[in-house]
């Protein structure tokens, strides 16, 4: 797994995207101090997962982002990508799967807001995934393979426990330590889960027993309901049978009328079928007719097309013939021109021969040349005379020339200034034109940057809102969970309390032994304890309990037959038993008595039976029994005295616990205090009823809370997904904003440079304009001096002209003779030019003749081509003429067939009209018969409605269909059924949905169970009574018990699994410890052996060793270094010099590499403390080991630089911005 390349952008001083390639062997990174070499090491540390900003030479992670410079703004993010070759096929986590790619690309990106992204091969990843890539490879952010600047001594100055980690990395037990740490964390979580599970298990177990009893009662009630339903359905089934019997007779009459209707319907159907066949035949003939017509039209169209094609071909033939005629005419003209040009060439050749002959007749120029020489000598003599005068003129001219030169220089300068001004003006205009467009672009890009920033801010706001919503949802969920926990706890408490009260009631504590035994031996459904029948408001419960406490275990029955009680009492005469005798009309409480009691007590007194909630079936028996018992709000001593002995009552109880009892023997009134110990039967009954209501409410609330909690959890998950998506959008928006901002800054920088250039040009233009004005003033002064010299020169020139006139005459004579000589020479040259011109004309004419010859050949080819096309066209015309005749014949035949088919279709339409008339007549007869059938149907509707009403009543009571209910327990007997209903009736009733099934089932049921109708009715009554005696039923108990039991069993299984998990985790940790100890021991010994060998090589002698501090099997033991450089005693490593420490550290690193070579190694200025000799030994070892591992060196040492295969130079061409340049060394 070797390094391939490192790509960094915006990381520390590397503003722009920089790619550093790493090849096999040794790669060096060099450059001046402070240029950013070590930033490459920091980038490697960072992308490998380093989390400490201090280790990356910064105070915080934001220090890693490009901080800007005098010229550039700070960067928006820092990004580093490390590409590794995966030649050894290492498996890594990419996305949601494990794979082994050929290249591993690790990316880490940091934004200014502190957000960090990790990616593996462009898939989002975790920091853990990146760290796992380097685990146990010897490479990584904190491994021995990367030594940062100034950290070479860290290896020797580290604590023994810290050095141990290097040996562990060699031993490959880092992953075991990570797994052990994860296992210990899992153990802690598992133990917490186990404690919570056991607490929950204990809480559920408390309520399970009470739920079991409630569930058994509910099951009994459910069984009774099913029996009630079954017998009720049987009774109603008899009613269905009677109704269907009446229906059958009525439908027999209806069937006869229907048969007649069916005969007419059959005839009508037959006619309609025939009519439909004829319609089909008509459509078929019509379709054939249309197809034939279509074919006829197609032939007609084809014929028209062919005729048009024939016309076009004839026209084409004419055009081709005209083209041939034109080409032949052109060929004739070209041949004539060719003859003319040949004659012209012959004439030009004759002229050329004549010119050449004349040119040969040369003139003798010797005499002319001697005459010219004599004139030349006389001319020179006269020239000398003139020259003397001329020197004086020249002297003046020299002075004038000086002034002229100055004037010329001024003029040149002015022209130069003018040219410069024009160039500058053009450049200024060009720059202004260029940056006028750039300003618009910059404004647009500013808008784009602003838009990107607004989008980023908007996305940030959305992200913030989503975070707030998620926090609110989490808070709401916590509140819901708290409420749910509170309600669940309250529900469990109340269910437990209810169960206890029901168990107390079921145990019949305080009930006479005789009553208990009696209820156990007889049918308990017919007898009830009076205390179980009494219910009242909570305010009166205490008073009712005091008033009726002596009668709470009295037996009550709705049955007037008391023989069973008497018989039991005879058999068990030693057991006490109270039984409420059959009804006796109460005659104690009259309106007069009640009025007297109200006067005595101040009006606030009520008969007790008016305050009780009694079952309907017991009211007739219990109300007389309670006659004479009253409840008053309160009474004191005065009230007691005001009640006369003559007032008839049995007892009066106040709500505050006082009791007035009248002695039935002597009529005396006694004052008593009610019992205040414990809870009475009435209060317990009230409490049970209240608890059942509260439990029902709590169950609804718990269910709603669970639903709300589930919905909010779903919303929370959706919001979290939205937040993740929003973060991705925000990341993209921020990157887009940073890119656009960078582009804007670049353009602004370019515009700023352009503006600077523009200012310089404008300033230069002003300077040139000023210099030009100064030059114009100087030119005026020169002009005045020149005028003065011109006057003096004019006088000299007059004398010179006189002398020079003679010289001119001589020159004229000389020139005349010389011109004559030159004319002869020109004439000869003219002859030569004419010869050349004639030769050129001959060549041009030959060229034109060649072109004409080619044109003639081309025309011949075209004429041949057109002749061939004419022959082809003539063949096509002949073919078309033959084809057109055939199509015209076929068109005529199709017209004949169309006429015949139209006649046949007319005959068919007439036959169809006759059948339609007959169908109309039958329809009238059917309509009249249907009216008669409707009258019959009205007569039997009532029977059907009654049958439906019975079925409907059963459905309303039990939500089932009576037909299905009967079908569930009846068997069919086809023979008996056929005896009852004949074939015609069966056929008729099959047309009515479900009617046969109902009647068949009703008959079958009546045949088999008719004699048991009375028994079914009695059973129905008994089941209803037994169901009513069960009292309040907790229907939820069955489901609650099953759910709680299932949950309890599930928790038991979970408990076993958690305990097993704890055992497995502890076993795994022990296994990890044993394996780690074994590997560490082996690795330590191997590194120690290599260290003993490498140390003398590095130092050129001496000895060294590694030593374990403590027991080597102790997982916390450290590693110490004992070293003895050459000529020194064995000493502690901390006493060594800086260079010796560095050499010792290098020895240790190379020793580790010999045991377990890392795929790559990065050394940052490790050779800085070493002298030349030690650098040489260091380089030799480095060269030997580079065959197994990649080495990246940051160095200032020239010898080390020579060792590198590839060299990167890091520079700062601009302040604060690093750049890297690579050189391949051989």
Curated annotation (Swiss-Prot):
GO CC annotations, alphabetized: chromosome; cytoplasm
Binding-site residues for ATP, renumbered to this chain: 32-39
An example molecular function term from Gene Ontology annotations: ATP hydrolysis activity
Broad class of the protein's primary localization: cytoplasm
Key words of the record: ATP-binding, Coiled coil, Cytoplasm, DNA-binding, Nucleotide-binding
Functional note: Required for chromosome condensation and partitioning.
Entry note about domains: Contains large globular domains required for ATP hydrolysis at each terminus and a third globular domain forming a flexible SMC hinge near the middle of the molecule. These domains are separated by coiled-coil structures.
Family designation: Belongs to the SMC family.
Assembly: Homodimer.
Protein name (database record): Chromosome partition protein Smc
Originating organism: Halobacteriovorax marinus (strain ATCC BAA-682 / DSM 15412 / SJ)
């Amino acid at each position: 797994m070797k390094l391939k390349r490192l790509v960094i952008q915006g990381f520390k001083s590397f503003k722009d995207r920089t790619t550093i390639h790493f090849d096999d062997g040794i790669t060096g990174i060099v450059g001046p101090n402070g240029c950013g070499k070590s930033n490459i090491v920091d980038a490697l540390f960072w992308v490998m997962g380093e989390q400490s900003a201090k280790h990356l030479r910064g105070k915080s992670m934001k220090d890693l982002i490009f901080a800007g410079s005098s010229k550039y703004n700070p960067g928006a993010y820092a990004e580093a990508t490390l590409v590794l070759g995966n030649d050894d096929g290492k498996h890594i986590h990419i996305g949601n799967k494990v794979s082994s790619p050929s290249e591993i690309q690790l990316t880490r990106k940091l934004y200014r807001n502190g957000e960090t992204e990790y990616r593996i091969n462009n898939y989002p990843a975790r920091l853990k995934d990146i760290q796992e890539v380097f685990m146990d490879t010897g490479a990584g952010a904190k491994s021995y393979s990367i030594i940062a600047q100034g950290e070479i001594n860290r290896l020797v100055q580290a604590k023994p426990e810290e050095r141990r980690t290097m040996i562990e990395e060699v031993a490959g037990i880092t992953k075991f330590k990570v797994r052990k740490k994860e296992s210990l964390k899992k153990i802690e979580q598992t133990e917490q889960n186990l404690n919570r599970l056991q607490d929950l298990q204990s809480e559920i177990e408390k309520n399970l027993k009470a739920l079991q009893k409630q569930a058994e009662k509910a099951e009994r009630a459910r069984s009774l309901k099913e029996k009630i339903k079954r017998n009720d359905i049987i009774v109603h089934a008899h009613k269905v049978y009677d109704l269907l019997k009446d229906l059958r007779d009525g439908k027999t009459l209806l069937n006869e009328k229907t048969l007649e209707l069916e005969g007419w319907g059959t005839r009508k159907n037959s006619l309609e079928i025939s009519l439909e066949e004829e319609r089909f035949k008509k459509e078929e003939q019509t379709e054939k007719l249309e197809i034939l017509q279509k074919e006829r039209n197609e032939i007609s169209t084809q014929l028209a097309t062919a005729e048009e094609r024939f016309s076009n071909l004839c026209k084409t033939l004419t055009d081709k013939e005209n083209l041939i005629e034109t080409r032949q005419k052109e060929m004739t003209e070209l041949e004539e021109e060719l003859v003319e040009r040949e004659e012209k060439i012959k004439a030009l050749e004759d002229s050329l021969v004549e010119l050449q002959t004349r040119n040969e007749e040369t003139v003798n120029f010797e005499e002319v040349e001697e005459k010219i020489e004599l004139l030349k000598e006389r001319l020179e003599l006269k020239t000398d005379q003139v020259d003397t005068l001329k020197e004086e003129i020249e002297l003046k001219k020299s002075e004038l020339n000086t002034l002229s030169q100055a004037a010329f220089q001024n003029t040149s300068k002015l022209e130069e200034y003018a040219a410069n001004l024009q160039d500058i003006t053009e450049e200024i205009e060009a720059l202004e034109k260029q940056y006028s467009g750039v300003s618009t672009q910059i404004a647009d890009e500013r808008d784009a940057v602003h838009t990107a920033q607004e989008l980023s801010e908007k996305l940030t706001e959305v992200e913030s809102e989503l975070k707030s919503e998620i926090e609110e949802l989490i808070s709401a969920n916590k509140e819901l969970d708290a409420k749910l926990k509170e309600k669940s706890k309250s529900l469990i408490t109340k269910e437990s309390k209810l169960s206890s009260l029901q168990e107390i009631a079921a145990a019949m504590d305080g009930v006479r032994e005789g009553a208990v035994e009696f209820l156990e031996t007889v049918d308990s459904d017919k007898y009830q304890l009076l205390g179980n029948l009494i219910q009242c408001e909570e305010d009166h419960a205490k008073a009712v309990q005091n008033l009726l406490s002596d009668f709470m275990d009295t037996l009550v029955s709705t049955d007037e037959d008391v023989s069973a009680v008497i018989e039991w009492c005879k058999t068990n005469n030693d057991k006490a038993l109270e039984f409420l005798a059959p009804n006796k009309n109460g005659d104690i409480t009259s309106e007069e008595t009640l009025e007297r009691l109200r006067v005595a007590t101040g009006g606030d007194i009520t008969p007790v039976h008016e305050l009780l909630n009694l079952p309907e079936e017991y009211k007739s028996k219990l109300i007389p029994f309670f006659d004479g018992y009253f409840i008053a709000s309160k009474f004191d001593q005065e009230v007691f005295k005001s009640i006369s002995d003559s007032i008839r009552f049995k007892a009066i109880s106040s709500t505050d616990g006082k009791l007035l009892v009248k002695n039935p023997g002597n009529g005396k009134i006694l004052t008593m205090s009610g019992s205040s110990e414990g809870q009475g039967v009435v209060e317990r009954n009230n409490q049970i009823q209240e608890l059942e209501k509260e439990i029902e409410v709590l169950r609804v609330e718990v269910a709603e809370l669970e639903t709300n909690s589930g919905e909010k959890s779903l919303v929370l998950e959706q919001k979290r997904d939205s937040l993740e998506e929003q973060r991705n959008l925000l990341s993209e928006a921020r990157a887009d904003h940073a890119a656009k901002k960078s582009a804007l800054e670049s353009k602004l920088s370019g515009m700023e440079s352009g503006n600077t250039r523009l200012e310089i040009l404008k300033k230069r233009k002003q300077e040139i304009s000023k210099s030009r004005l100064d030059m114009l003033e100087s030119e005026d002064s020169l002009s005045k001096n020149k005028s003065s010299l011109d006057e003096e020169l004019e006088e000299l020139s007059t004398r010179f002209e006189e002398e020079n006139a003679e010289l001119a005459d001589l020159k004229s004579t000389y020139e005349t003779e010389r011109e004559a000589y030159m004319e002869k020479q020109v004439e000869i040259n003219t002859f030569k030019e004419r010869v050349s011109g004639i030769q050129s004309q001959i060549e041009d004419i030959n060229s034109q003749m060649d072109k004409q010859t080619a044109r003639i050949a081309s025309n011949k080819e075209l004429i041949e081509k057109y002749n061939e096309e004419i022959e082809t066209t003539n063949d096509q015309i002949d073919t078309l003429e033959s084809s057109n005749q055939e199509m015209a014949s076929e068109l005529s035949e199709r017209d004949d067939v169309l006429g015949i088919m139209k006649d046949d279709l007319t005959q068919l339409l007439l036959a169809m009209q006759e059948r339609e008339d007959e169908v109309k007549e039958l329809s009238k007869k059917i309509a009249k018969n249907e009216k008669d059938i409707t009258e019959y149907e009205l007569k039997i509707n009532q029977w059907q409605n009654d049958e439906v009403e019975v079925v409907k009543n059963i459905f309303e009571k039990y939500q089932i269909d009576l037909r299905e209910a009967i079908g569930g327990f009846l068997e069919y007997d086809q023979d008996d059924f056929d005896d009852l209903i004949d074939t015609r009736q069966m056929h008729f009733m099959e047309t009515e949905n479900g009617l046969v099934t109902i009647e068949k089932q009703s008959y079958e049921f009546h045949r088999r169970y008719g004699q048991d109708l009375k028994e079914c009715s009695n059973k129905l009554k008994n089941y209803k009574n037994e169901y009513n005696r069960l009292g309040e039923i907790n229907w939820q108990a069955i489901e609650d018990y099953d759910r709680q039991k299932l949950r309890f069993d599930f928790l038991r299984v979970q408990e076993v699994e958690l305990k097993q998990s704890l055992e497995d985790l502890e076993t795994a940790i022990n296994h990890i410890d044993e394996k780690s100890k074994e590997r560490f021991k082996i690795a330590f010994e191997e590194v120690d052996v290599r260290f003993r060998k490498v140390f003398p090589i590095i130092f050129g002698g001496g000895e060294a060793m590694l030593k374990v501090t403590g027991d080597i099997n102790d997982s916390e033991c450290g590693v110490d270094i004992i070293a003895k450089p050459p000529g020194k005693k064995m000493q502690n490593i901390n006493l060594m010099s800086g260079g010796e420490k560095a050499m010792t550290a290098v020895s240790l690193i190379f020793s580790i590499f010999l045991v377990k070579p890392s795929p790559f190694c990065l050394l940052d200025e490790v050779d800085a403390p070493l002298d030349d000799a030690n650098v040489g030994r260091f380089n030799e070892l480095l060269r030997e080991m580079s065959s197994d591992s990649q080495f990246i060196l940051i160095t200032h040492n020239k010898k080390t630089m020579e060792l590198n295969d590839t060299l990167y130079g890091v520079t700062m061409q601009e302040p604060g911005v690093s750049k890297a340049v690579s050189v391949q060394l051989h």
